């Protein structure tokens, strides 16, 4: 199949985003709905018939294409974006002028976590920077934060480059002894955390310095790790919430509109939870399709991994109810151990096929400072 794939046309990705933007600007729900079929067609063509030319790039790009498709389902089809408002917005969205709607749509499209909107889940996000903080104070602080994430990412990447379990022809992550499995699981998490945090912090510095956005629009992308004493709090409060809007709105649609289940019931809560984790699994599984292609059914583990997370949360919830558990200091310490052990057990089975396919080729930066200091070679390491 790979010999018949065409180069991924960047123009189609732009066209998909243009359709989403037009839909967000438009006052007409009918017009928005008419935009979804071309978004679906363009997305399916890219996913099924094209490639970036590098499987370790395809896995990321295919997940992004799927995310845009689901965002299209949210904006164009299952919800009315006119119901959304910015914080402090008094004029109904459909009554804004064309120029105001264009700016409003730009804010919506660039805010996957709904930062600055009334539907932002502020109770689960880190605090916003203070609105009265001077711009250059924010820029200096975020610049130091960005440097910190760069150092962490560079060190983690050097360790990954030197570790056989992350290489295409390396040792299986599931076959190493448990102490090393603990270490490699922590390294993988540290890479994702530092990589996304670095990019996010760097973007905040640039965009605030240019006056494109305000400093209080940049709450940290990851939450406080002290909340990771349950699987539920890890996914809901610690890990990034970039997909929160699209997984929750589709969960709402399936649970409360399609199945019409009453809110607050055991069945409705779990249908919503499993739907949300299923959607997250789909995003990552389609990414795996871009990497594995004909071997996707044998190697993909995303759906299994994310549905296991929903199951773990269900078990936590019911055990907590039965034994009336409260987050005492002792139970929190035990909870941190439980959370880490859970990921040591479940994560390697999902990630190992990806590492054998070259997933770590994309990790870090082309030139590594720590690798150069360690090996005396200032060279490309990815």
UniProtKB/Swiss-Prot annotation:
Gene Ontology MF: a single term: O-acyltransferase activity
Presence of keyword Cytoplasm: no
Top-level class of the enzyme under EC nomenclature: transferase
Location of this chain's protein in the cell: Membrane
InterPro entries: Wax_synthase, Wax_synthase_dom
Disulfide bond entries: none
Catalytic activities: cyathatriol + acetyl-CoA = 11-O-acetylcyathatriol + CoA; cyathin A3 + acetyl-CoA = 11-O-acetylcyathin A3 + CoA
Functional summary from the UniProt entry: Acetyltransferase; part of the gene cluster that mediates the biosynthesis of erinacines, cyathane-xylosides that show unique biological activities, including leishmanicidal activity, stimulating activity for nerve growth-factor synthesis, and agonistic activity toward the kappa opioid receptor. Within the pathway, eriL converts cyathatriol into 11-O-acetyl-cyathatriol. EriL is also able to acetylate cyathin A3 to produce 11-O-acetylcyathin A3.
Family named by the database record: Belongs to the wax synthase family.
UniProt name for this protein: Acetyltransferase eriL
